Amino acid sequence: MRPAGPVPVCCRAGRLMRVFILAGEPSGDRLGGALMAGLRQLCPDVQFDGVGGPAMESEGLSSRFPMAELSIMGLVEVLPKYFHLKRRIAETAQAVLAMRPDVMITIDSPDFSLRVARLVKDASDIRTVHYVAPSVWAWRPGRADKMAKVIDHVLALLPFEPPYMERAGMECDFVGHPVVTEPEATGADIAALRTELGLGAAPVLLALPGSRRGEVERLAPVFGAALRRFLPEHPDMRVVVPVVPHVADQVAQQVAEWPGAPVLVDPRGLAPAQAAMRKRAAFAAADLALAASGTVSLELAAAGTPMVIAYKVNWLTQKIAERMVTIDTVTLVNLVSETRVVPECLGPACTPENIAARLAAVHADPAAQDAAMRLTMERLGRGGTPPGLRAAQAVLDRLPG
């Protein structure tokens, strides 16, 4: 597969393509790894520099510093790290300017990556690409205009995002969402997980209280209280809690006080492929899920698991968000499918009573979300060219010929 347009100068025989690529959290690292693989497939003579995690390092990147330093979320959480982040921003921008790459690609993490892009643009004409469009369709639409001052090209994960970016003056391509590339768990995978966890044939409720420490701290107690209301009506149901390594101990402490003898699906000590398989099997085995807001709703949709979404942030972030949010749902399944079938308990509505009531409603009619979940996967690109390769082609297609 070759770029659809003229082959860029940097991709011609005998010319090394130089790419500075920057990711700030695990989801961005996975996007970056797939994009790097796609770029190498289309343009074998490519050199990478930048910041990333295991997925990008497996594609040949030597990260300039640990990506974990950048995994910060929320207005209040960023403040204590401000001066350290400011130093890293300056260091990274200087590294880009010293490399003089054909393109700099930043992936999500806008608090960090767009500040790097601003310093780079102030001092050079280096082409900038940002992977993952900001959710200007949800809140703070003015971010697109500010972003257009430092970003030339956006790679969007969601099909409705390009017009928002283009109106601000940036080039934008929908390249598909990585969730569509995940293999489905087989019946054998699900049976093996049930046996391993001692679930037998019991119905399963999947609980996902977040992948960041602040999320777990805020959501896990509320989830536990909701389960105390919901589970007495469903005494045979087992609670399964997939975790990510960096919050596994924190989640284990929290769920120890939950009812229903919850079982953790812990990836620590496993090879990445095995850990991913167990997570997919847990999602597919579940009869319903209670999850924090975010990309996890798409993972559940990919597995066909009906869900309730719940989320709360700290008081200050909540008050700021209330003044800026412009949409009536934050769940990506609802947005992509243009439905509102996935119930939400957000902010002040994130209470045990509300969550338990919505779990009961979803459990009573689990098929109500099926059509929306299938449509979501179709619109995100399931069955088509892998998003990493589509993203790589989009980057190359828009480089100067």
From Swiss-Prot:
One of its GO terms (molecular function) is phospholipid binding. Pathway: Bacterial outer membrane biogenesis; LPS lipid A biosynthesis. It comes from the Bacteria. It comes from Ruegeria pomeroyi (strain ATCC 700808 / DSM 15171 / DSS-3) (Silicibacter pomeroyi). Pfam families: LpxB. GO terms for biological process: lipid A biosynthetic process. Condensation of UDP-2,3-diacylglucosamine and 2,3-diacylglucosamine-1-phosphate to form lipid A disaccharide, a precursor of lipid A, a phosphorylated glycolipid that anchors the lipopolysaccharide to the outer membrane of the cell. GO terms for cellular component: membrane. Belongs to the LpxB family. Keywords: Glycosyltransferase, Lipid A biosynthesis, Lipid biosynthesis, Lipid metabolism, Transferase. This is Lipid-A-disaccharide synthase. Its EC number is 2.4.1.182. It catalyses: a lipid X + a UDP-2-N,3-O-bis[(3R)-3-hydroxyacyl]-alpha-D-glucosamine = a lipid A disaccharide + UDP + H(+).
